[in-house]
């Protein structure tokens, strides 16, 4: 079966990319959540560790608002960027723009799933104890919208020299993040650096409506 309608092809591609990222993000989180104790770390290479941690904040563990408000923010962002993505699909802009918005939406959805559901379906992750386990719906460690986001990717590339002020002895890029965070970051960075003009034109332009005469 072939699709000759460009709108259908672009729509299917955009949402397939988003679905693939969300699925991969959740699979990685499932493996880590079910096999690692909280703060457990496995060194893959000297500069790449799998380090299990959880947070209630935004990407890379940043804390700005309460978990429930953050969930609402994510829902609004997903809805907004989905509308923008639909406009981009119709406008026949480049595939790169389309994929960027798919990545951003997928990342927001991936972390929203943690935020909304993990408190309901997982037991508590404890430091140096037994890994968490799936449980019956509603019997987890928290309530709806109180789930903690699972992070695991840690890249301690190097440590700053001790003699440097403020940053001496600290690890360069000490953030722990997940695949959803990476998708959001890659999507935004590519848009800002490579598609600035198109971003300004399509992301911030308000919709216009044509006036019609009454019959």
Regions found by a protein language model. Give the residues of each.
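Alpha-helical transmembrane bundles and membrane-interface segments of multipass inner-membrane proteins
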Residues: 1-215
């Amino acid at each position: 079966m072939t699709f000759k309608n460009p709108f259908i092809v672009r729509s299917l591609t955009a949402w397939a990319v988003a679905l693939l990222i969300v699925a991969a993000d959740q699979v990685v989180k499932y493996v880590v959540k079910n096999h690692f104790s909280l703060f457990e770390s496995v060194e893959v290479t000297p500069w790449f560790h799998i380090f299990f941690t959880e947070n209630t904040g935004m990407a890379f563990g940043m804390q700005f608002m309460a978990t429930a408000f953050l969930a609402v923010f994510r829902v609004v962002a997903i809805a907004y960027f989905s509308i923008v993505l639909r406009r981009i699909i119709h406008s026949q802009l480049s595939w790169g723009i389309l994929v960027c918005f798919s990545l951003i939406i997928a990342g927001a959805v991936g972390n929203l799933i943690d935020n909304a559901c993990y408190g309901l379906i997982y037991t508590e992750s404890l430091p140096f104890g037994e890994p968490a386990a799936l449980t019956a719906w509603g019997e987890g460690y928290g309530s709806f919208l109180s789930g903690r986001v699972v992070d695991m990717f840690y890249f301690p590339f190097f440590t700053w020299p001790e003699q440097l002020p403020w940053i001496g002895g600290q690890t360069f890029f000490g953030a722990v993040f997940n695949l959803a965070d990476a998708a959001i970051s890659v999507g935004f960075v590519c848009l800002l650096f490579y598609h600035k003009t198109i971003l300004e034109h399509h992301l911030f332009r308000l919709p216009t409506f044509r006036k019609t005469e009454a019959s």
